[in-house]
Amino acid sequence: YSYLYTTELLCAYEEEYDYLNDYPYFHILSLGCGGCADLMAFEHFYRMHSFVAPISYIGIDVNELWRPINNRTLKYCENNGINYKVRYADVFKCFRQHIVNDTNVIVISYLISYLYNTNQIGVIDSFLEDLVTNIVQKKNKGQKLLLIINDVNSYKRGRTYFSQFIRKLEKYKLSIIKCTYKYFDTGDLFDGQKIGTPHLVKRSLFSIPEAIQRKYHAESNCKKTIQLMLEVV
């Protein structure tokens, strides 16, 4: 699914081009980073628009099976001037003990559905509390921050919890200057799944090699995914 995940997040970055255009640097924090599809998408977006601001990336994931892929990504980043780190830790415990300063892009992709699927959805409120107090509030005063939530367009498993991000930011008097919902229209959505406006993209924006398609039965059609982009100052 890396091709589709990268496509989804590239669409999110493109939606936020005007907001990101004058960033003096990009300090990306990815919660539940996996194979870092969000960084792949960002690097493509960055090159497409000829950005020159420095990039740093911190990924957090509990699953060390991603390590071989992350190690290859590290080598690529070292050769291309990207400061890249991955920490293998439980996201939901990590920020009770650690503060991250000056982050200005936060990506949370398929983390809510992971909580639901593993019967941990009850921790979402405390997770959001830690996210806001130990990460979002630690940005520089007046600094722009983009929060991207990308998840399953399904009741309870994804979009149901998006509004909690907004309420938690408002609780701590952070200013949300823009709130954007986007979804991928698979042609068979219920009205309740059509929140915001659809992306025009229907298929992977990246060519999937035939060998990978055969070996992994890789699909190129976009899935039922919904996104919330929050511009915060």
Regions found by a protein language model. Name each.
Residues 1-20:
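Class I SAM-dependent methyltransferase Rossmann-like catalytic core
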Residues 53-55, 78-85:
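A short helix-to-beta-strand connector/capping loop
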Residues 70-71:
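Conserved SAM-binding loop
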